[in-house]
Amino acid sequence: AAWTPQMAAGMFSLSGAQAKIAIRWEEGRWGLPYGSQATTHILKPYWDGLPGHAINEHLSLRLGARVGLAAASSEILSIGNATVISVRRYDRVVVDEQSIGRVHQEDMCQALSLPPSKKYESEGGPGIASIVNMLRRNLPVAVAQDTVTRFLQAQALAWAMAATDAHAKNYSLLLAQDAVALAPLYDVSSAAPYFVNEVRDVRPGEVSMHKAGLAMKVSKHRKFNEITAQDWKTLADQVGLHPEETVSLVAAVVQRVPSATAEVVELFNQEPGRTPSERKFADTYKTAVKRQATLALRSIEGKGIPTRRP
C-alpha cells in the first residue's frame, strides 16, 4: 500500500494495508474450514512498508497482558520468507473434541449502529466518552462499572505505548447468552518504533511524532505530547466519573509499562529460533515504548510540559 499522510500520522488500518486470513488449527496442522466449521486463528503477513510490524503486534499484545489487561494470544511464525503473526481467536469455545463454537461479538461501531467507515473519531466515529456512555446506558450497573474500568485502562495503555490505531473497531463486546464482557485486546501495535522528528519529510515506514496521537481524544486532545492529567480529569467529568480516581487508574497502568516492556522483550529475545533482525527490532521496540511511557508518566504526574500548538 502507498504511504499516505494518514499512515505518516500512525493511521495504519486502511483498506488494503494489512492482509489477513482466517484459518483453522486442527490435529497439529493448519487448514481451511469446511462448510460451517469455525476458524480458530487469524494469520497476518505484514507488508514491507512497515518493518517488523508482525513482531510489533505480538509484543504489544504481550505487553497488554503483562500490565494486567486481557489480550489475545499470539505467536510469531515463519512461513516461507515471510514473518507472520498468528492470533488465536478469543471468540471461539471448544464444544467437544470435534466441534468449536462461535461467540458473538460486536465492535464499538456496531454497538453504536455506526458503519465501519466511522471507526476513527476524526472521521466522524465515536470517542471515549461516547463509548463509555453507551456501556453505562446498556449494561447492568456492576458489569458496566467493570467494563468501563477496563476500557479506560486500555486507553491508558494506548497512550503510554503510542498505539495510534486504537479506534472503535479495535474494541469489541463479547455477547454470550445473558453475559456481556469487553473482548480482550486485539489489533494493537505501537507507532513509537517508527517515530521520527519530522513534520513534512516523512518517508515510507516512518511516523511523525508531531502528528501522531490517539485514535480517540482524551478530552480535547489526541496528540501524545499534548495530553495531560487535566485532560483525563475533564474526560472523567464528561462521563460522570471521579476525576482523581480516573487519573489514578490511568497512572497505575502507565507506571507499569516501562518495566513490563523490558520483561516482554527479554522473554521474546530468549525464545529459541529468534533471528538477529527480530531481536534488533524487539530492542528498538523496547527503547521506543519505554521512552513514550516515560513521557506519558511525566505528563500525568505534572512534570512534563505539553507542547500544544495554537
Describe the role of every protein-language-model region.
Residues 1-168, 172-310:
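Anionic ligand-binding catalytic core segments
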